[in-house]
Amino acid sequence: MVLFNVSRVETTPFGDQKPGTSGLRKKVKVFKQPNYLQNFVQSTFNALTPQNVRGATLVVSGDGRYFSKDAIQIITKMAAGNGLRRVWVGQNGLLSTPAVSAVIRERVGVDGSKATGAFILTASHNPGGPNEDFGIKYNMENGGPAPEGITDKIYENTKTIKEYLTADLPDVDITTIGVTSFSGSEGQFDVEVFDSASDYIKLMKSIFDFESIRKLLSSPKFTFCYDALHGVAGAYAKRIFVEELGAQESSLLNCVPKEDFGGGHPDPNLTYAKELVARMGLGKSNSEVEPPEFGAAADGDADRNMVLGKRFFVTPSDSVAIIAANAVEAIPYFSAGLKGVARSMPTSAALDVVAKSLNLKFFEVPTGWKFFGNLMDAGLCSVCGEESFGTGSDHIREKDGIWAVLAWLSILAYKNRENLGGGKLVTVEDIVHNHWATYGRHYYTRYDYENVDAGAAKELMACLVKLQSSLTEVNEIVSGIQSDVSKVVHADEFEYKDPVDGSISKHQGIRYLFEDGSRLVFRLSGTGSEGATIRLYIEQYEKDPSKTGRDSQDALAPLVAVALGLXKMQEFTGRSAPTVIT
């Protein structure tokens, strides 16, 4: 057994290590600065209770992006230096973010141990590579992201750090499954490399009826396509969709994980998932080949999802509402009923209507999955989602892209249980249109203005807040831009009081609410690594079934004009068009 010694290394603080909603994300060159990663990791260990460090078990893995392998070795040595008992690593350093959550909650090590937390190495949907983004976040013993109380402590520690602890271990082989043991002054330290997918697959099989999905996928009527965008979802896609569920291997796109995501942007939306969008018949040029019935994509760390039907896009806001409306019938895990449902504030109110109709508890929370986690830990929420392509349930404490795809396949299997032999297939588009006929439609779009000058973005938001003090003035501006829209009846900055722990989150987005249920929401996003991103959300509710079939951009055009005029978007940003429209 290799012996190791622990050393204390002097360091000085960096001023830019404040974690955002999903940890710390920066360019790779920033993380490669001497002691940059080490400072953040030590500041995290120092923010945790002693029982979550000394003698504890830590998971360290991620989406496989560039610099992950180096980071795993650095963190493993620091874990030994800080007195942890063992580190668990997914084979090749790969674990999806939802799989990390599942591993913390479900996995038992070869020696009977349980994990108390994890460092997840991901910048989610941001690009990867030597000149692109890297990220790190800490998840707690419930499998969810560190709450603000912990991330605030981490940030305070980064401002005063003077030293970090590390051990002189050799690099560990993370390509081969097995346990490597070392001996230090406080006893044994183990690094266990384990299969990245098996724990997660076992959990999925306990939630869904794999046999009914297998029947659907084996039907000649039903065709399927899944695009991992060269992210970590590829490590799960073949095992689940091909080996477990019998899909054709040719139905998988870009399912080999790559450090730079194949040079692409691993963000599952209509702009970046070009190959899937074209295959599903939604591209600018129509393919002569008949598109598949169902398509889906994942982001870099596989916690986000995009769901498509043949020539049909399902908005994430509709997706979570449709899953909630069908969960009890179609998914065995929910057969006893839903405890409640929740959505992030910018997400459309489609879920609210389902909750009201089904008499379910309903919660509207700020953006950030940790808010859902609190509700789930208290037994108040079963299904939740956000407009940024995140959907999930209380099976783990992260959003889960593959779970969402399996949920949709379960609903399709249930709706088609009688007609796989004969009769017309119930399609994704049919399911969505039937949902609108029952609950009404929330026309919805999101405009993203990426890498905007941070000063200009803050000024724009400040003007919108100031404007809220006079609804009369707001309505004069609105009617001057577009005379045929409803009037604004309420305007505020969204604030959330957590019903579980009483904590208050302020400044969570600027809202303008209209008399007819329409909404405009403006947010500054904290997930980019450079500049600011302004997100503008536009929503209009239509209850009349004869009016739910319009093109959403056409239906929303008057409100879009109001939003851009109210915010003086071009004046502040210099942009005549958004970077991305969803």
Curated annotation (Swiss-Prot):
Pfam families with a match to the protein in the record: PGM1_C_vert_fung (PF24947), PGM_PMM_I (PF02878), PGM_PMM_II (PF02879), PGM_PMM_III (PF02880)
UniProtKB keywords: Carbohydrate metabolism, Cytoplasm, Glucose metabolism, Isomerase, Magnesium, Metal-binding, Phosphoprotein
Annotated catalytic residues: 124
Sequence positions that bind alpha-D-glucose 1,6-bisphosphate: 25, 124, 303-304, 367, 386, 388, 399
Enzyme Commission identifier(s): 5.4.2.2
Location (main, coarse): cytoplasm
Residue numbers of Phosphoserine PTMs: 124
Entry GO MF terms: magnesium ion binding; phosphoglucomutase activity
Binding site for Mg(2+): 124, 299, 301, 303
Gene Ontology CC, one term: cytosol
GO BP terms in the entry: glucose metabolic process
Cofactor(s) needed for function: Mg(2+)
Catalytic activity: alpha-D-glucose 1-phosphate = alpha-D-glucose 6-phosphate; O-phospho-L-seryl-[protein] + alpha-D-glucose 1-phosphate = alpha-D-glucose 1,6-bisphosphate + L-seryl-[protein]; alpha-D-glucose 1,6-bisphosphate + L-seryl-[protein] = O-phospho-L-seryl-[protein] + alpha-D-glucose 6-phosphate
PROSITE patterns named among the record's database cross-references: PGM_PMM (PS00710)
Entry function: Catalyzes the reversible isomerization of alpha-D-glucose 1-phosphate to alpha-D-glucose 6-phosphate. The mechanism proceeds via the intermediate compound alpha-D-glucose 1,6-bisphosphate. This enzyme participates in both the breakdown and synthesis of glucose.
Record's protein name: Phosphoglucomutase, cytoplasmic
Provenance organism: Populus tremula
